Amino acid sequence: FCEKMTTFAVGMSLSSIIKSSGVRNFTKLLSANVVAQVIGLVVYPILTRIYAPEDFGLLNLFLSIGNVLIVLSIADYYYALVLPKHEKDAVALTHLSLLLLLLTTVLVAVSVLFSEQISILFKSPKLSWYYWLMPFYVLLVGGWNILNYWYIRNKAFGRISGYQISQSMLLAGGKIGMGYAGALQGGMIYTAVVAPLLSLLTSVA
C-alpha cells in the first residue's frame, strides 16, 4: 500500500511539474525554435540550387555588419529588461534602448551616403547596391530584440514563439520566391529585411 501511495505521489509530482507554467513556456519556446531550425534545414538545399556561393557570402556580410551595429547601438540594455522589480524601471530601460536604437539607425542612414567607400572597405563592391537597406535591418531586428525581452518579462512566450516560426517561414518562402522571381543578387538580403518587418507586425497584432 505504501509503495502504491509513493508511486502515486511521484506521478502526481511529475504531472504537476509538467503542467507548471515554467515548463510549458520552456516547451513552447523550444518547440518553436526546433520548428524554425527544421524549416531552415529543409529549404537550404533548395536555396543552394537557386543562389550562387557569392550570394550567400554577400548575405552573411550584410547580416554581420547589421548585427554588430545592433549590438553596439543597444549596448545590451535590453537584457536588463527582465531584472527590475518595478514596472516603471523596466519601461525606462525600454525607452533608453529604443532611443539608442533610433540614434544608431539615424547614423546608419547617414552612412548610406558613403556606401561606396564602405563596400571598398569590406572588399565587396556589390554591398553598396544593398547597403541602403541597412538602416531598416538595424531598426527592425534591434526593435525585435528589445520587444523580445519585454515579452519575456511579461511572460508572453506565445508571441515569441509565433515570431520565431513566422520569421523562419517568411525567410524560407521569401528567399525561394525572390530567387525564382529572378532577384538572385539581392533576393536573400531583401528577404532578410522584409521578413522581420512582417513577423514583428504579426507579433504585436
Question: What are these language model-derived features?
Answer:
Residues 50-53, 124, 154, 181-182:
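Helix-loop interface residues and adjacent transmembrane-helix termini in multi-pass membrane transporters
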Residues 5-22, 158, 185-189, 201-205:
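Interhelical loop/hinge segments that connect adjacent transmembrane helices in multipass membrane
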Residues 6, 106-124:
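Short membrane-interface helical motifs at transmembrane helix boundaries
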